[in-house]
A protein has these predicted regions:
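Non-catalytic C-terminal accessory region of glycerolipid acyltransferases
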Residues: 54-194
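Catalytic core of membrane glycerolipid acyltransferases/transacylases, capturing the structured
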Residues: 1-50
Length: 194
């Protein structure tokens, strides 16, 4: 969805643990109540400053996991887009960084799937908006529309690292985790409403 899915996950994790962070776009640091939990990422990665920021975030994320903390990651680094109003929304290609981090820290993984999609106008314009301010304004607009509405999420079972250790290739591990996550869509038993 863009913002509200991250807020829901932070809220859920905070009920049982305080040692968590969420990797998200640096512009979301404006959410002051979440600032201490945000590991900022600059997805443009074009400038020296953005590269420096991303390296610092990667180091902090690795340290968090090595210390047994929880890291919330949206592996595509973006918002799922539907090709048309009748289609489901799907992620862009998943980044390989989460797979690298999993292998480096030998961490377990909990897949979570959010059911639903943003409004029609969002999907019509999402791929066309180049201006970052307009793009993030559209995320805020979608978030406001969802306040007070039901959002269904599917929470999978923890995948122990020993079960995925043999998937040495980052591509292979990423594909496996993506498949496991999208399978959750059909797992009604573990469906939660927030």
């Amino acid at each position: 969805f863009g913002i509200i899915d991250g807020l829901i996950l932070c809220s859920l994790v905070s009920e049982i643990r305080s040692d968590f962070k969420i990797m998200t776009h640096e512009t979301l640091k404006f959410l002051s109540q979440l600032d201490q939990f945000i590991l900022p990422v600059d997805f443009s990665g074009e400038t020296k400053d953005s590269k420096k920021l991303n390296i610092a975030t990667a180091i902090e994320a690795k340290k968090l996991l090595e210390n047994g903390g929880v890291l919330i990651i949206f592996p595509s680094g973006g918002v799922s887009i539907a090709k048309d109003i009748k289609s489901d929304a799907f992620d862009d290609e998943w980044k390989l960084f989460p797979a690298k981090l999993i292998h480096q820290t030998k961490t377990d993984v909990l897949p979570i799937y959010f059911d639903g999609k943003n409004g029609l106008l969002f999907h019509i314009f999402a791929s066309k908006i180049r201006n970052q301010t307009l793009k993030y304004s559209s995320y805020i607009h979608e978030t406001r529309k969802k306040i007070g509405k039901k959002i269904f999420i599917h929470i999978g079972k923890i995948i122990p690292y020993k079960n995925i250790e043999e998937l040495k290739s980052r591509h292979e591990l990423t594909d496996f985790l993506k498949e496991e996550t999208y399978k959750l869509k059909f797992n009604i038993k573990n469906k939660k409403r927030y």
